[in-house]
Amino acid sequence: MTAETLEAIENCGAAEMPIAETCAITEITEAQYWADQSAQRRYRIGQLRSKMEIRQAVIKMAKAGVPQMVKVYQDFVAETNRDIPPTVGSDDAPDQ
């Protein structure tokens, strides 16, 4: 795929466009999309870029004291903490 097509796919991912609509916009078939790992990767990068930008905006508002955003930020922290393995010596560390 061309660099222009991959960029458009990434932008569609950032906008959370469905795959079928992404393919229509970029004028490729769904089979072409699913056969190309770089297209799938760029779509996911677009999604993650938007997720990061939204989180950054939430954090900025939480720091400014917006109560609703403080709660959303706390939910983000809880989600992130589920991804972090327990440290050695913590109560949650698996027995060895």
Question: What are these language model-derived features?
Answer:
Residues 1-27, 31, 78-96:
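Charge-dense (acidic/basic), low-complexity helical/coil segments
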Residues 2-3, 48-52, 56:
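Amphipathic alpha-helical repeat elements characteristic of tetratricopeptide repeat
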Residues 14-17, 41, 66-67:
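Residue-level recognition of short, well-ordered coil/turn positions
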Residues 34-51:
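Short, solvent-exposed alpha-helical "recognition" segments
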Residues 52-96:
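Amphipathic alpha-helical protein-protein interaction segments
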